[in-house]
């Protein structure tokens, strides 16, 4: 959960006037080869060969610089600005499937898509929020969409530079963040294999970018000065949602269903909704009941945003295998027996392959997070032999485990209950 929706306090009115139209920021076309044209003319033959993409026509996409506001875990939370409670305000996070709006690449805080450009049968904003699924636990739609867009934003640059030493700069948090691509012999890869390797690298690195954000939040990074984001660090639904976004766009890239922004936006919208249905999404009233059932266990409704320990349960298990936090019969207990039917489905565990075409992906590209001196003291709980000013994504799981130990000690000292 990387941007708390406190900005809704002052953007709700403004957003009404920020309606715009979708536009194609990129549109490329596959080309038939001369052999395919000759075969067609000579014998009216059809071919199963894919048309090719001219590298000189690759769009100059980048990772989006603007990010979506996302949800603090819980429902109808109170908010404080400094020591002052915001009167008569509660943060309403929960949405349901029918309310989800059309996707927009790099939408930032707000974007309106007209119905003529939408594949969902209706226009509107993305209308992000959280919802509960029986097989995937809570899903934060802003996290899904951000990592989806990061995957898309990385793909063509990775594809164009595959096999070469290359650096891709990312928005800074704690310090510079970037992707280091290593030089290797890619001459034996076919065009289809290069496409597949680049697609998997893009999804994997976009996901690790999300992991680096969780680390940055825990160690003091904040999007807005004076508004701490420690409440959001390692929130239990974040990384599963991020990986879902990476997998959605990995699937679209593999099927070449993202060659224009319009096509990309429409297909993300369709596959996101289909994925939520497969995960067993419930309606808004049921999601609210689930949040109420885990109040005092996973979050504390008596605390206000941005108090870190409004969130009681966190997810520190980083890596390319993500298991969701879901209801269990034991968690619900007798007092929530009416929700036991939501705790019966098996979990869907998400994974991102570590190797493709016999290539170890971590050996050919790494995500790097550098720590500026102003944040170095926030890493004092971690032995120096484990971290340095430069942290690679393969070290992220160890960094997170030290955060888990530190949080456990703080919660015990504060007598904060975590069940």
At which residue positions do the language-model features occur?
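Bulky hydrophobic segments
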Residues: 21-231, 250-419
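Bacterial N-terminal signal peptides
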Residues: 8-17
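Bacterial N-terminal signal peptides that target proteins for export
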Residues: 1-9
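Long, internal stretches of domain cores in catalytic or enzyme-like folds
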Residues: 226, 241-248
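A glycine-rich, coil/turn loop motif that links secondary-structure elements
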Residues: 231-237
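Divalent metal-coordination and catalytic microenvironments
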Residues: 214, 238, 244
């Amino acid at each position: 959960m990387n941007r708390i929706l406190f900005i809704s306090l002052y953007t709700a009115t403004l957003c009404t006037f920020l309606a715009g139209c979708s536009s194609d920021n990129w549109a490329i076309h596959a080309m038939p080869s001369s052999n395919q044209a000759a075969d067609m003319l000579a014998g009216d033959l059809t071919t199963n060969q894919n048309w090719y993409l001219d590298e000189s026509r690759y769009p100059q996409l980048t990772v989006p610089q603007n990010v979506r506001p996302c949800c603090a875990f819980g429902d109808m939370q109170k908010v404080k600005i400094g020591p002052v409670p915001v009167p008569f305000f509660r943060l309403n996070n929960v949405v349901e499937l029918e309310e989800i709006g059309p996707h927009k690449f790099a939408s930032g805080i707000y974007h309106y898509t007209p119905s003529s450009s939408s594949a969902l049968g209706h226009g509107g904003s993305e209308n992000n929020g959280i919802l509960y699924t029986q097989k995937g636990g809570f899903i934060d739609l802003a996290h899904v969409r951000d990592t989806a867009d990061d995957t898309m934003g990385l793909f063509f640059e990775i594809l164009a530079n595959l096999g070469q030493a290359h650096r891709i700069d990312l928005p800074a948090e704690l310090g510079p963040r970037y992707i280091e691509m290593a030089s290797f012999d890619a001459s034996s890869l076919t065009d289809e294999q290069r496409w597949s390797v680049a697609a998997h690298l893009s999804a994997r690195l976009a996901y690790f970018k999300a992991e680096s954000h969780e680390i940055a939040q825990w160690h003091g990074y904040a999007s807005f000065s004076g508004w701490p984001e420690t409440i959001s660090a390692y929130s239990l639904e974040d990384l599963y949602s991020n990986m879902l976004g990476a997998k959605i766009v990995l699937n679209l890239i593999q099927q070449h269903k993202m060659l224009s922004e319009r096509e990309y936006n429409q297909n993300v919208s369709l596959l996101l909704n289909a994925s939520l249905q497969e995960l067993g999404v419930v309606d808004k009233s049921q999601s609210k009941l689930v949040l109420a059932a885990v109040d005092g266990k996973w979050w504390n409704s008596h605390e206000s945003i941005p108090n870190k320990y409004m969130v009681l349960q966190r997810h520190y298990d980083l890596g390319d295998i993500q298991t969701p936090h879901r209801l269990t019969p034991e968690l619900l207990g007798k007092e929530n027996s009416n929700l036991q039917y939501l705790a019966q489905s098996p979990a869907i565990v998400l994974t991102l392959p570590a190797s493709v075409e016999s290539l170890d992906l971590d050996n050919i590209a790494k995500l790097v997070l550098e720590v500026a001196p102003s944040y170095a003291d926030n890493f004092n709980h971690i032995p120096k032999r484990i971290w340095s000013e430069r942290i690679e994504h393969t070290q992220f799981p160890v960094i997170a485990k030290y955060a888990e130990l530190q949080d456990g000690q703080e919660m015990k000292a504060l007598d904060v209950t975590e069940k």
